[in-house]
Amino acid sequence: MPEIRQLSEGIFEVTKDKKQLSTLNLDPGKVVYGEKLISVEGDEYRTWDPRRSKLGAMVLKKFDIPLKRNSKVLYLGAASGTTVSHVSDIVSEGAVYSVEFAPRSMRDFIGLASRRKNIFPILADAGKPDSYAHIVEPVDVIFQDVAQPNQAEIAARNAVRFLKKDGYLLLSIKARSIDTAASPKEIFKEEVK
């Protein structure tokens, strides 16, 4: 029988043949991106590939992930929903406001969102938070995963508009989207300022 170890609220390590990062599946029987489903004593866990998810990689690196069962999350750069689906599992009684700019990615994402009561897909430019302010309530966590040269500015705009006092901003800086020639270390240092 697989062993379950809770790493943080809603995030687990399931050991069946090997250790695998997992979340409790909010949509039993359904996969999102080809991940494995593991059933243990009536619960179904979805494996979470940290090579396909920056947030998953953060968990493996032992970052404190500030997501709780009832958290309200603004996810900027939802793409087709790989990581958003795991956030949805974790914040099962909360909400995931998921902003994506690309219509093609959003088309794929809509199918996932239609099966999960806590995902709210928003086709919009994350750099223009006022355009979706009528949809998004104040949030506990903002996770940004956009590939724009002004990533830090976009994060700051959204934080000012939506982040609750004592909320958390998780910013995934994509150095090559900012400058293809500069040293990533220098870019990171500059963006954090």
From Swiss-Prot:
InterPro entries reported in the protein's UniProt record: Fibrillarin, Fibrillarin_CS, SAM-dependent_MTases_sf
UniProt EC number: 2.1.1.-
Alphabetical list of Pfam families matching this protein: Fibrillarin (PF01269)
Keyword terms: Methyltransferase, RNA-binding, rRNA processing, Transferase, tRNA processing
A GO MF term: rRNA methyltransferase activity
Annotated GO biological process: box C/D sno(s)RNA 3'-end processing; tRNA processing
Binding-site positions, S-adenosyl-L-methionine: 82-83, 100-101, 125-126, 145-148
Enzyme class: transferase
SMART domains attached to this UniProt entry: Fibrillarin
Superkingdom to which the source organism belongs: Archaea
Assembly and binders: Interacts with nop5. Component of box C/D small ribonucleoprotein (sRNP) particles that contain rpl7ae, FlpA and nop5, plus a guide RNA.
Recorded family membership: Belongs to the methyltransferase superfamily. Fibrillarin family.
Primary role: Involved in pre-rRNA and tRNA processing. Utilizes the methyl donor S-adenosyl-L-methionine to catalyze the site-specific 2'-hydroxyl methylation of ribose moieties in rRNA and tRNA. Site specificity is provided by a guide RNA that base pairs with the substrate. Methylation occurs at a characteristic distance from the sequence involved in base pairing with the guide RNA.
Protein known as: Fibrillarin-like rRNA/tRNA 2'-O-methyltransferase
Protein encoded by which gene: flpA
